[in-house]
Amino acid sequence: MAGKPPHSDPVQDAPQVAGPKHAAAGLPAIGHSLRMAQQQMGVKRTALTLLRVNQKDGFDCPGCAWPEPEHRHTAEFCENGAKAVAEEATLRRVTPDFFAAHTVADLATRSGYWLGQQGRLTQPMYLAEGADHYEAVPWERAFDIVAEELTALASPDEALFYTSGRTSNEAAFLYQLFAREFGTNNLPDCSNMCHESSGSALNETIGIGKGSVLLEDLYKADLIIVAGQNPGTNHPRMLSALEKAKAGGARIITVNPLPEAGMERFKNPQTPQGMLKGAALTDLFLQIRLGGDQALFRLLNKLILDTEGAVDETFVGEHTHGYEEFAEAARAADWDETLTATGLTREKIDEALRMVLASERTIVCWAMGLTQHKHSVPTIREVVNFLLLRGNIGRPGAGVCPVRGHSNVQGDRTMGIFERPAPAFLDALEREFGFVPPRGHGYDVVRAIRAMRDDKAKVFFAMGGNFVSASPDTEVTEAAMRRARLTVHVSTKLNRSHAVTGARALILPTLGRTERDLQGSGEQFVTVEDSMGMVHASRGRLEPASEHLLSEPAIVARLARRVLGDGSRTPWEEFEKDYATVRDRIARVIPGFEDFNARVADPNGFALPHAPRDERRFPTATGKANFTAAPVEYPKLPKGRLLLQTLRSHDQYNTTIYGLDDRYRGIKNGRRVVLVNPEDARELGLADGSYTDLVGEWKDGVERRAPGFRVVHYPTARGCAAAYYPETNVLVPLDATADTSNTPASKSVVVRLEQSAAN
């Protein structure tokens, strides 16, 4: 039997702290996975469901985008993947009776954890203007409401069409097609808040905004650098790949402000030896200060240039552009400035250099620790410089590896979910569908929030996700959402965005990855693209949580027919009945998807082409891989201030809160904690266990306050602190973003810590 949802929010006023762990996974991970799954699904459903996760005839995990190996284990999932599946396949249900019992104002007082624990949404729900409660409505009435508001807009650009990274390729392609037929490129997505900096940097330097390695490359590498990433919590199956790489002789450098259990030791639950002893992963830990990565890679590049024979001159001469300007800037790198920026010692950097020079095949992996700073784009460009110098792109066992978060965030971008589409993509849409797509750039996430705030956007439609909790500057974001005429969320579960609404609001319940999708032509499957550009099918097997659910492609197709009417030549009804017809159109519009239906029938899927990886061909403006030379930047702190990074707990995936613990960091039963270096804490007079308010400081002079955080003395880098989001998103200014990519700078928030009334 599955457990019942919590009746009230659990008390979190006394978190328990035991200190960080030094190994990840193992028997505890198995126990936590199964316990949480059984609470949501019961014993039988847990077994039947988890054995289908990431299998060739099963469904793609709705969690992270880490690729599946060619040879799958019987249990091809991690602890957090099991939690994600359990959340979706839960037996708990949110019915119209629930909404009758809870006003929207009441829901707004509840925690994200409590909201998510209530279960699966079962019927379309409508909040009328001035009403206190959502009420059930038929699907056709829901589509009528959306159509009323969209067709009443003065311009299509007053509508926003947001996408979460769980959305399938088929749904994403139809969604962007509908938005563009409607007349706007306002297609903000979750990538704007995470790896936009990666895409911006990689497009300019190597000509494609994706990583250049496949899973097999990790097993061929001599050196893997993992920078600004915590695989043990955010991509646990990556630890298996790193373990295999280590067994093959690879060495690993970890660059991060926090020591993380997963990168110290991995206890592989797939093997008896792994569960008992585990494998040490990191050979060298560089405990860098937040935002110091550009300075580190710049100095490493200088040292490579200064080492005779270290530069791959043949590769540089044949395949790159801008080398001389870059080399001049790199040779000017200063040791003292680098040590200040990074907080590292000269000895540690020298040791890293020795490992770099000993490697013929190097991969650099990274995540949000590199992408969410003001200078993130030049930082990632410097990583590319580092790899280009020694010919480490377009070679087996080498390359760039931005590790994406949500399961199809990369696929959604490939399908055209982008506010700044390439002209060639729009030309292909025009040829295939016979309409003229808009050419002007649309709004990304930050600009979309500004547009709602300034009454330039009036309808907000979200295909999945939890926009309010994912976005920066919480008070500004929530006020902006409340100015909209209509907010619409296609969702599987209840979340805070359903309680922060426009004048009118709709919740449209949809099928999950785990569920069967029956349409007019029979049972359907969808496809996804993983973090390494592999495309494969996903087939749900469970009966839908409610007879009233529609799939995401069906929702888009029906809405498009209602809004666009007879003026659209697109066969929306055909697309809803048979997703193979959608894939046929994708094959004709998007390069790399030729013979899509035939190729995706392969149980292993197929790899999308990647010119730098496959041919050492770089489709940039220069026709070569571009070295770049930007001034070195790093955050400079006023006295008595700390640099805060927002991050996830182990019981969390993006904005979904599975529980109130952070097992690997030793935190239990509470999320309002701030991790502070003990020496910094002593200088600031912060006792371990005391309570503090986090107060953001930025150039606009606005006070942004997150009250009541328990101080935890923790071995983070000096001058740095860490706390969980979404609780700390209130501290991230809307306009504090990365240059070029406009990604919120959530990893470099200047804060002061003031004594809390909770003491």
Region annotations inferred by a language model:
Residues 79-93, 161, 380, 384, ...:
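Flexible, low-complexity linker and terminal segments
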Residues 56, 116-118, 156, 359, ...:
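Sequence-level motif detector for i,i+2 pairs with an aromatic at +2
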Residues 35-42, 50-157, 257-360:
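Cofactor-/ligand-binding subdomain signature composed of acidic, glycine-rich
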Residues 1-58:
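Intrinsically disordered, low-structural-confidence terminal and linker regions
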Residues 196-396, 403-585, 640-643, 647-759:
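Non-catalytic alpha/beta scaffold blocks inside enzyme catalytic domains
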Residues 134-137, 141-220:
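Long, structured ligand/cofactor-binding scaffold of large enzymes
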Residues 575-663:
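Long, low-complexity segments enriched in small/aliphatic residues
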Residues 124, 162-164, 645-647:
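Acidic/polar N-terminal loop/beta-strand segments that form early-domain functional surfaces
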